[in-house]
A protein has these predicted regions:
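Single conserved hydrophobic/aromatic residue that forms the stacking wall/gate
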Residues: 286-295
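Formylglycine-dependent sulfatase
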Residues: 1-287
């Protein structure tokens, strides 16, 4: 797909140059949960009717379907994994599973309390901090979809009179994520998984077990929250970013435009319908995905 001309991605380029890139690869669903369960089970969402973020193993069709992990395991593979692979994980599928998916680090306000979650990045203006839940998911603002900004020292920063800090995500119970500077900070969840994968590969190489293995590592980014070390933001000064070309009148035939210009009552399409509230883009650019395979 070539990517953005200003994107600095040496590792992806190295993988692409040494593997095969598929120019017409399409996601099975434009949100992560049903897309992952479809990809790893081989069952299309329109056959399973699993379109939303409910646990895939509670779906009648998928509950009676074996994932690729189970298939490998049944055929003598040692299957190990870590990170965000299936949106809702079942550890019993694996021979060994290390870290559950963690979307952190996230901003945290005040003292840690049971049931208390993170907040939007402190640089996000207050009007855009409001959370709006649709089913199980927040589709507007908040710690996940309402966060964009750099990791920075917030030791002396308060918001609404409360001290700010950084925290790992919910799977780690919002454990403190220590950050003083880029040279003095905890590892991000993706970095933890990368280190684990490297160690696991070396461990398997030294093992006397001759069985083949299947290893899956699920890196979170570029999934929201869009929080990363400052050095990555410094690579792209806002005043130098080239904006994408947009065709004239390109937005005139969208679903939301139809609703607004034709005065369609929201009740007709469902006030709480995920199609309307999430405004999940279903277009060519959102259904295509970069797919590279290296053997």
């Amino acid at each position: 797909l070539k990517g953005h001309p200003q994107a600095i991605t040496p590792n992806i380029k190295k993988l692409s140059d040494s593997g095969t890139s598929f120019m017409k690869a399409y996601t099975n669903n434009p949100i992560c949960g049903p897309s992952r369960s479809s990809f790893l089970s081989g069952i299309y969402p329109h056959n399973s009717l699993n379109f939303w973020q409910k646990p895939w193993y509670n779906n009648d069709v998928l509950a009676n379907t074996k994932t690729i992990v189970e298939k490998f395991k049944e055929n003598g593979y040692y299957v190990v994994g870590s990170g965000k692979i299936l949106h809702h994980n079942k550890k019993e599928l694996w021979s060994e599973f290390e870290h559950n998916s963690d979307l952190g680090p996230v901003a945290y306000k005040g003292k840690k309390e049971k049931g208390k979650i993170g907040i939007s990045h402190p640089d996000i203006p207050k009007p855009f901090r409001t959370e709006r839940m649709v089913g199980c998911c927040n589709m507007n603002g908040g710690q996940i979809d309402g966060s964009f900004g750099p990791l920075k020292n917030v030791e002396n920063t308060k918001l609404d009179g409360e001290q700010l800090s950084w925290a790992y995500g919910g799977s780690r119970g919002y454990k403190e994520f220590k950050y003083t500077s880029e040279d003095e900070r905890d590892l991000t969840p993706d970095e933890i998984n990368a280190q684990w994968a490297e160690d696991k590969i070396n461990e398997l190489a030294r093992s006397d077990n001759d069985s083949p293995f299947f290893l899956a590592v699920g890196f979170v980014r570029p999934h929201t929250p869009l929080i990363a070390p400052q050095k990555y933001f410094d690579m792209y000064p806002l005043e130098k970013i080239e904006l994408a070309n947009i065709l004239e009148n390109d937005m005139d035939d969208t679903f939301l435009n139809y609703v607004e210009t034709n005065n369609v009552e929201k009740s007709e399409v469902g006030e709480n319908n995920s199609t309307l509230t999430h405004k999940q883009p279903v277009s060519y650019t959102h259904l295509t995905l970069p797919t590279m395979i290296r053997v």
